[in-house]
Amino acid sequence: MTDRTDADDLDLQRVGARLAARAQIRDIRLLRTQAAVHRAPKPAQGLTYDLEFEPAVDADPATISAFVVRISCHLRIQNQAADNDVKEGDTKDETQDVATADFEFAALFDYHLQEGEDDPTEEELTAYAATTGRFALYPYIREYVYDLTGRLALPPLTLEILSRPMPVSPGAQWPATRGTP
């Protein structure tokens, strides 16, 4: 679902930690959606999916105590296929798309700074959107995908649980870097 490494994700969590300790979610909205079924699924093959996230943050310097996290999502649902199902000249991507969906959720967060604290930086807000904000919106994204696939006359799709890497104990070495879902 993403190409960030565990180390990158942990670094973002650290940068956004001050905001994560003070922010509360106040409202969630589906801002836009577009979905299409491109071909019928092959029941004998089963389906697989790819979900990409693009987090962003909107913050108005005049409104110091609130910001909006937007998560744009691109979902591709494909037939599971063996390599021999791909015809010469075709790519797997061209032969497998059953449905696609593009949609965007937004969440309004507010926060309260302690006396004497600096306002959140753009880096903190962006890190928060990519970590805690994404985590906060994921259950809504997950439920929406389940509902959407049923409405498109596809088997309801239950997305995997969104996971975070485990923090490393002080003095311990980082495990081998790998991509995370």
UniProtKB/Swiss-Prot annotation:
What InterPro entries does UniProt report for this protein, alphabetically? SecB-like_sf (IPR035958)
Its induction note reads:
Operon autorepressed by HigA1.
Q: Which domain of life is it from?
A: Bacteria
Q: Which UniProt keywords apply?
A: Chaperone
What is this protein's function?
Chaperone component of an atypical, type II toxin-antitoxin chaperone (TAC) module, probably required for antitoxin HigA1 to neutralize its cognate toxin HigB1.
Q: Which family does it belong to?
A: Belongs to the SecB-like family.
What is said about its interaction partners and assembly? Homotetramer, interacts with antitoxin HigA1.
Q: What is this protein called?
A: SecB-like chaperone MT2006
The species is Mycobacterium tuberculosis (strain CDC 1551 / Oshkosh)
Gene designation per UniProt: secBL
